[in-house]
Amino acid sequence: MASGILVNVKEEVTCPICLELLTQPLSLDCGHSFCQACLTANHKTSMPDEGERSCPVCRISYQHKNIQPNRHVANIVEKLREVKLSPEEGQKVDHCARHGEKLLLFCREDRKVICWLCERSQEHRGHHTFLTEEVAQEYQVKLQAALQMLRQKQQEAEELEADIREEKASWKTQIQYDKTNILADFEQLRHILDWVESNELQNLEKEEKDVLKRLMKSEIEMVQQTQSVRELISDLEHRLQGSVMELLQGVDGVIKRMKNVTLKNPETFPKNQRRVFRAADLKVMLKKLRELRDVQHYWVDVTVAPNNISYAVISEDMRQVSSPEPQIIYEAQGTISQTFVNFNYCTGIRGSQSITSGKHYWEVDVSKKSAWILGVCAGFQPDAMYNIEQNENYQPKYGYWVIGLEERVKCNAFQDGSFHTPSAPFIVPLSVNICPDRVGVFLDYEACTLSFFNITNHGFLIYKFSHCSFSQPVFPYLNPRKCTVPMTLCSPSS
């Protein structure tokens, strides 16, 4: 309908002489309007008498002095030139803007429609030119292929957009579900786990805010990406439905835009890599805490017993044990050197308490130490002490049930050596998520078990010796190794 109205308006502002839109329109007394150039040319050919002329359309006479520029019609023509009509009734686009000649040729190098004067210009000299009809089919095929590719990309873009929205909804649902469960579990354990609840909810809400913010940004990018492809498709569809001129006009830019279309995948977050604190974690933690509370009922006050064999440095209260500082030795030639005692066998020391029955628990502070060994021993055997240099005596069969740390991170248990190497202990690497600053030791003499707890990590069990052969009294055992930082026996009140 709009196209028909525009066509009618165009007819009203078309010059009856040149049949083109009026240029510098002049109106006569009869109401008809003509281009200034057309009316001037008509005057020269009509040769009027006594200054009277007649309208080329209705033949009504008019005076030359009565000719008036029609600014209203000129404005209508100007607006009409800016309006793009439908393909059936559209404006003529087949004339060269520079030369006014018909655009009948296509320049292969510049991918532009040109006229015969453009072909002879310096700009296109030496270029390969063809009739527009000759290349139209070729570009029809290219644009059709481009359209097909873009439709496929549109489908992919829409699928990516749908996926990101689905993932966004899934994330919101999952996090809401996790939040609800965490709230319910913490409500039951609020009296002992308030700080855990607060910490976990804060982390979860921070994760929700961060992930949803990034997913929202990714969703916006996907929507913009889809819209961009749609707009390019619309442009191509319009060209393919239009005339040859509309198909080829600016085709180079369209092809470049088409080639630059690259779909960006949205940012995703694998849920299986998340670590969500769950009720099971609370139950395990609570169980460990209860186990620790149970064994702490058997806490005994342990101190160390000085002896003439160990080189360990003992504090006045008999609770701290450390390795001696390096000794300075003056050699015969007057040179000075530093040397360490052999810490592997010289710094071990036992507790003063002799254990022959019952349940006993104590804790050892090993914070800031890079190496240590602790547990229980069946008593020192001076003849065997000198064989401990490579940890060879740290075996249950020799009366040592111990675990140790070395190089700050390697935690090991020492079991009996194998059949092939009976003199060397079998080293059991221990998986400790948090390096202990404080270790709890629980001895059940009748059950023949010795357990070690990581007080730093909610009392989780580090290692347990079972079926221990306690055939004689055993004693708490400490060895600070080469690390001069002290290890401290904690009092029950600590």
From Swiss-Prot:
**Stretches for region Required for interaction with GABARAP and for autophagy:** 186-199
Q: Where are the zinc fingers (RING-type)?
A: 15-59
Coiled coil stretches, renumbered: 132-241
Give a Pfam family name.
Answer: SPRY
Q: Per the annotation, which location comes first and is thus the protein's main one?
A: cytoplasm
Pathway connected to this protein: Protein modification; protein ubiquitination
List the PROSITE patterns. B302_SPRY, ZF_BBOX, ZF_RING_1, ZF_RING_2
Extract one GO BP annotation from the record.
Answer: protein K63-linked ubiquitination
Q: What is its EC number?
A: 2.3.2.27
> Which InterPro entries does this entry report, sorted A to Z?
B30.2/SPRY, B30.2/SPRY_sf, Butyrophylin_SPRY, ConA-like_dom_sf, SPRY_dom, TRIM/RBCC, Znf-RING_euk, Znf_B-box
Query: Could you tell me which residues carry N-acetylalanine?
Result: A2
Keywords in alphabetical order: Acetylation, Antiviral defense, Autophagy, Coiled coil, Cytoplasm, Immunity, Innate immunity, Metal-binding, Nucleus, Phosphoprotein, Transferase, Ubl conjugation, Ubl conjugation pathway, Zinc, Zinc-finger
Per its UniProt record, what CDD domains does this chain match?
Answer: Bbox2_TRIM5-like (cd19761), RING-HC_TRIM5-like_C-IV (cd16591), SPRY_PRY_TRIM5 (cd15822)
Q: What is known of its domains?
A: The B box-type zinc finger domain and the coiled-coil domain contribute to the higher and low order multimerization respectively which is essential for restriction activity. The coiled coil domain is important for higher order multimerization by promoting the initial dimerization.
The role this protein plays is: Capsid-specific restriction factor that prevents infection from non-host-adapted retroviruses. Blocks viral replication early in the life cycle, after viral entry but before reverse transcription. In addition to acting as a capsid-specific restriction factor, also acts as a pattern recognition receptor that activates innate immune signaling in response to the retroviral capsid lattice.
Instruction: Write down the PANTHER family for this protein, in alphabetical order.
Output: E3 UBIQUITIN-PROTEIN LIGASE TRIM
* Full protein name: Tripartite motif-containing protein 5
